[in-house]
Amino acid sequence: MQKQRLLNVGFGNFVVAERVVSIVNPASAPMRRLREEARDQGRLVDATQGRKTRSIIVTDSNHVILSAIQAETIGQRFIQEENS
C-alpha cells in the first residue's frame, strides 16, 4: 500500500500532496472568479479558520481550497514533502 503524503495548509488542515495541481495567490480577478465559481458549484473548501485568504489550492478533482498561509510558504512545504 502506497503511503499518502499530506501537505499542511495551516491550522491543522491537510491536503493529500499528490492531488494538488496548483497553489496560487488569491489577489487576481481570475482567482476571485475561480473562488466564486467553486463556491456556487459546491467545490470550495475553506481552511482559513476565519482568517484572511492568502492562497488558493486547486486539486485534480477541481476542488478549490482556501488557506490563510502564504502561497510561497505552502509551496516550500510542498517541495519539502516531495524531497522527504
Swiss-Prot record:
TM regions (residue ranges): none
Disulfide links within the chain: none
UniProt superkingdom: Bacteria
A Pfam family this chain is assigned to: RemA-like
Family listed: Belongs to the RemA family.
HAMAP family, per database record: RemA
Name of the protein described by the UniProt record: Putative regulatory protein Dde_2720
Organism encoding this protein: Oleidesulfovibrio alaskensis (strain ATCC BAA-1058 / DSM 17464 / G20)
